[in-house]
Amino acid sequence: MEVKAETMRESEPNNTIETSNIITRNDETAYGAANGTYDGQSVVYGYSSKDDIDFYKVYLYQGINYMTCNDHDFEYEITGKDGTLIQKGIYKDLNIFGPTAYKVDIPRTDYYYIKINGCSSKSESYLFLIGSPTYSVNNYSVKCTEGTVSMTQSNGNKIVHFDLTSVEDIPKDAIVYSVSMFGIRTTAVKSIKLKNEKDKKEILLEKYVWNKKALIAMEMPAVSTWSAILEYNKNISFIPTLRVDYAYPVYNTMIQ
């Protein structure tokens, strides 16, 4: 699979507005994170210190954007073409999992300047993206609320439920790109139909492997109650487990 993320490396000299490096706005989507291509991702990579200021020029859209930072500590400052200060801040590497994002309200669609200044006396690396939020992926597994399910040959259909509505680790904006069912006897199953109770969308899991991939376009919310219609053809008891794989925008920090 081709990775389509773009990495732009700092090019010296860029210590004045006039010598600013022109960079590309980050334009990531959940789809790119889910399929591993990271299409639209634009990462800026450079080195800075207290005595080494770096300038970048970027075209941003009006509205909420995100300054996503990683690596070593640095100060950032975002200004308009006329020198108007839009936002400034300090990124601190607190050894948290992944990058930290800061919301930036851009007043109008136009070019803007970003000033980066390292916090150390020695030159240290930094990373940032600006524009859309970056996306990450994660997963969560949950057993059915009914506990042990008993099936018979004469009554082979049952509905079970999986509750992810109160799972704090799943971001509210997470959308599903893959689902899997575990804890079942593959040879005893006829079919499994899964339903997202929040948006009422249904999917039929692939037979024998009991999963379904490439679901990102359906935009199903991960935070939901899920129901499954299980069709069995044997006398058997089991505890089904649902695994939900999801992508989510990083509005602050990633969830480990």
Regions found by a protein language model. Name each.
Residues 38, 100, 107, 123-135, ...:
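Long luminal/extracellular ectodomains of secretory-pathway precursor proteins
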Residues 98-105, 162-166, 210-218:
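Exposed aromatic-hydrophobic patches
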Residues 54-56, 116-133, 235-249:
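Edge beta-strands of jelly-roll/beta-sandwich modules across compartments, strongly enriched
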Residues 84-95, 144-149, 189-193, 197-213:
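Solvent-exposed serine/threonine-rich low-complexity stretches and specific carbohydrate-binding patches
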Residues 3-54, 62-65, 91, 133-159:
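Non-catalytic extracellular/lumenal accessory regions of secreted precursors
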Residues 113-115, 196-256:
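Cysteine-clustered segments with highest specificity for TGF-beta superfamily mature ligands
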Residues 46-111, 115-123, 171-175, 180-195:
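Acidic, Ser/Thr/Pro-rich low-complexity intrinsically disordered segments
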